[in-house]
Amino acid sequence: MTETLIQFSSQKRTRSRQMNMIQTMQQIPSMNKEIIFDLESTGLLRQGSRIHCIVMRDSNDDSTSVFDHRPEQSIIQGVKELERADILIGHNIIGYDIPLIKEQYPDFNPQGQAIDTLVLSRLFYPHIDTRDYERRPDGMPQRLYGRHSLEAWGYRLKCFKGDFGKHEGNWSVYSPEMLDYCIQDTEVTLKLWALMKRRMKDYS
C-alpha cells in the first residue's frame, strides 16, 4: 500500500510538472528568443565531469553558436549566454544539462524559462511504442521502439543523431567529431521542438 501511494505521488508530481511546462509554453511571447542548446562532457552528474562544449541554436533565425575552449568563445561565455536567454530548450536539460552546469558553475542562474523536450515527449506521446510498431520508422532499430530518447526521435523525424561514442569515440578528450555530434543533437532537438509546438495546439 505504501509503495502504491509513493508511486501515485510521484506520478502526480510528474503530471503537475508537465502541465506547468505546457502553461509556460502557452504564455511565451512570440518575440522572445528561443535558444536550443546541448552540451558534451566527460561523464555523468556528480562524477566531477568537465564540459567540453556547448552548442546553442537560435530557433528564430537558425543561427548556431559554439562555445568550447577557445579564448574568444569559452565555456564560461557560453554559460553566461544561457543565463541571459529568454527561453532555454533542450532534451533532458532538466535532468542533466542544467544540473551539470550548476555543478560546475554554482553561481549559474538562468533568468529564462526552461523547456525540456524529453518531458514534453512523454506527455504528448505516452504510447509512442504503439506508433513505432505501426509506422516502423526507416532504419530505426527495434530496441528504440517506444523510447523518448533523442536518438529515437532522430529516426522518427528523419534527422539522424550521430553515433559518436558508440564505437571509437572518447568522451574524455574533446575532438571535432564530438563537436559535430553536439551540433547534430541541436538539429534534432530543433525539429523535435517544432513538432512539440504543433502538438501543443491540442492543449489550447
Protein language model features and the residues they cover:
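A generic structural-conservation signal
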Residues: G112, D163-F164
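Conserved RNase H-like, two-metal-ion catalytic cores of nucleic-acid enzymes
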Residues: T4-L144
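Mixed-charge, glycine-rich, non-catalytic linkers/tails in nucleic-acid processing enzymes
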Residues: L120, G162, E168-S204
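Amphipathic alpha-helical transducer elements in NTP-driven molecular machines
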Residues: L144-E151, I183-T186
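Glycine-rich, acidic and aromatic/proline-enriched surface loops and short helix-turn segments
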Residues: Y155-F160
